[in-house]
Amino acid sequence: MATPSMMPQWSYMHISGQDASEYLSPGLVQFSQATETYFNLNNKFRNPTVAPTHDVTTERSQRLQLRFVPVDKEDTQYTYKTRFQLAVGDNRVLDMASTFFDIRGTLDRGPSFKPYSGTAYNIMAPKSAPNNCQYLDPKGETEAGKVNTIAQASFVGPIDETTGDIKITEEEDEETTIDPLYEPQPQLGPSSWSDNIPSATSGAGRVLKQTTPRQPCYGSYASPTNIHGGQTKDDKVTPLYFTNNPATEAEALEENGLKPNVTLYSEDVDLKAPDTHLVYAVNQTQEFAQYGLGQQAAPNRANYIGFRDNFIGLLYYNSNGNQGMLAGQASQLNAVVDLQDRNHRTSYQLFLDSLYDRSRYFSLWNQAIDSYDKDVRVLENNGVEDEMPNFCFPIGAIETNMTFTQLKKSENGGSRATTWTKENGDDGGNGAEHYLGIGNLNAMEINLTANLWRSFLYSNVALYLPDKYKFSPPNVPIDPNTHSYDYINKRLPLNNLIDTFVNIGARWSPDVMDNVNPFNHHRNYGLRYRSQLLGNGRYCKFHIQVPQKFFALKSLLLLPGATYTYEWSFRKDVNMILQSTLGNDLRADGAKINIESVNLYASFFPMAHNTASTLEAMLRNDTNNQTFIDFLSSANMLYPIPANVTNLPISIPSRNWAAFRGWSFTRLKHNETPALGSPFDPYFTYSGSIPYLDGTFYLGHTFRRISIQFDSSVAWPGNDRLLTPNEFEVKRTVDGEGYTVAQTNMTKDWFLVQMLAHYNIGYQGYHLPEGYRDRTYSFLRNFEPMCRQVPDYANHKDEYLEVPTTNQFNSSGFVSAAFTAGMREGHPYPANWPYPLIGEDAVQTVTQRKFLCDRTLWRIPFSSNFMSMGTLTDLGQNLLYANSAHALDMTFEVDAMDEPTLLYVLFEVFDVCGVHQPHRGVIEAVYLRTPFSAGNATT
């Protein structure tokens, strides 16, 4: 087999296309064209699901897919390892491209799993309304007479004067004895507002004893303890009797004794809050007193948990040792050699995007790409359409709390004086009833559209603010582990950072949110879909089909007449294989996975004997090696950027740059990037999207400038661009020359480079890319320009004051001053923020511009003739770089971030794997990655 040094230079870039016909050898392409009725080689994906229509020799050859059971398996703490024996019979060709693992097991997504927003329990209750309950006096004393009650006796009916129990009437109008273990039921009451005319004088209900902990009605749950729905936990229900008439014992004696007109059945229940928590709480000494009645609940934050897109992270690819094996019968040497930086996970994401629309979801391979709502990432604060006031009225509309007596008019004899007397029937206590209201109908106004918009901003933006803009509510116990769900869930955002008046009228992403991972959000529809595939319960069984994405083997055909050993390891680290909305540490929060079985499904091409023999002979020929190229075809490197650092120099030692195509790069957060060399990274306490693996890049906007300098005197890429050679300016804050573009701070130069690199559009005239090029990860689709005006504080220091958010007030008296979702406080008063930017009172402003470009890898193509790169191959490269060794120095200037990050650089090199099978049971593989590394393996 040819060694790397023997491969001719001229052939490097002529097999760089992604279509199979471009990188298979000519002989094999000719063969595939002659046998199109058997299988299709387009785009690396074969379709072996339809049997051929002729030349099929045996029944066995029509079995297109076989299940292989592992001959050996090893279940350890961190991995599950399986080994298979692949027997490829005569007249059969095994297609490793379409193999997949069929995995069954059980999954505990942990107590942090919450697949919905809001609460499932008493969602209609006000957030701080108490349940019917008893409470202690403010001093917390419990002696007789010191236990107070607050309750609604909704079950209206007469009270038995002898027993004190409420009388319940059955359908036959017969009164029955109640069962206090569940009667009266709390959901029953008058069916209509008119049932309360006249006002009910007696009734009953249930009430929680003072020994049951305080909890707002919103989110309250107590499990039933009997089939009737009763909830008392010890079968001890104590009736309590109350009266409100007469008031004193002396009056009672005149009325023949005191009589109850309200009976409450008190009980202790197992009160819980499964999906809510307190955001306003009193200290423990006041919890059982009246102060505990006003505690406020909020729903736990939604946290979808499912397998990652395309099961990223489940198959363990070690970059330092061989965790996978493909060995032939004749030798046990491993054909899966050390491919330290093949990027195959990110490559696979971009590869699939080039094949079909990733906005379509497929359950079979868990293909539901991570996404975010653009209306959340880039806020268009258009205000609210609230020209019409919104009123709410009493259910009966007319007030019924004022009772009137009907009069009649009569004239008095000769004096004709008018007198008034009661109408007949209205005299005494048995007269007619008249409930009359005076004036307009009583109503209350609520600004529905403003509340909906404010609620959207709070739930979708404010709750996702960085932790430094949040506080821990007093008296609420919080886990000190900042990566835990309890901590993330209970922290509250500071007021006025995100509200209806912030950036009103602008299309602008809040600056504090730009560096927050937008894919870690409950509006990540791909993650939500993958979570829902597993069901809506914490504990679930899973049965998944996981494709093998290892690019060295992706399109490999195993030839007939041999047995191969094939083994792989599967991770069991829940932070790596599962993805959560909030990115909390699933290990610490109790998630667990148990793999019960792994089978391998492999597809064969059934062929007639002559056809199979011909294919085998051709593939065994030295000139017909199977040649496979990684989609990104790059060597990746990670460079740490410490917190608050803005300059990062990189040096690459001297080497030959033949076949080099350029650079792709972006920025990653350190805590979102695992160490891939270990099956279990103890420092990876995060479970959100992993940009390093799944392509959810979002920090591209933090680059300012890149300089690239070879150690030669030749200026690269020439002085035919706007700026100086060897330097690329991404954005500029001050633009005196007008070098920025598209109402942003991106330079025209950088815009030109990206259009060249992504679409091969080499001029700045009006031109749009072809549709097939503008896919999910492309430049223009993700380019988000933004612009806004802010008061000119610098030049008007005496007039315009930068009031801190804690001293800003807007809608005072109608909203909370403590945090956005709190109870309203204060009184109506003119707002002091923001400064008006419109109308006759508009202040002097300055214009701010910026952009976001998520998902996209910035690219700088490498060519000596930069403006005439053609199809971006190496054909135009200067011979100085192509045939001589040079050292490379790069300097990246970036925005400072207050946490450690990583510079992710892809050196677009020639990355190829050649596979040869000269004899049955023997596989030879050569791996070439110039200019960075080469290797080979023979089995």
From Swiss-Prot:
Matches recorded under Gene3D superfamilies: Adenovirus Type 2 Hexon, domain 1, Adenovirus Type 2 Hexon, domain 4, Hexon Major Viral Coat Protein, domain 2, Hexon Major Viral Coat Protein, domain 3
Annotated keywords: Acetylation, Capsid protein, Cytoplasmic inwards viral transport, Host nucleus, Host-virus interaction, Late protein, Microtubular inwards viral transport, Phosphoprotein, T=25 icosahedral capsid protein, Virion, Virus entry into host cell
Gene Ontology CC annotation, any one: host cell nucleus
Top-level taxon in the UniProt lineage: Viruses
Induction comment from the UniProt entry of this chain: Expressed in the late phase of the viral replicative cycle.
UniProt protein name: Hexon protein
Subunit structure: Homotrimer. Interacts with the capsid vertex protein; this interaction binds the peripentonal hexons to the neighboring penton base. Interacts with the hexon-linking protein; this interaction tethers the hexons surrounding the penton to those situated in the central plate of the facet. Interacts with the hexon-interlacing protein; this interaction lashes the hexons together. Interacts with host dyneins DYNC1LI1 and DYNC1I2; this interaction might be involved in intracellular microtubule-dependent transport of incoming viral capsid.
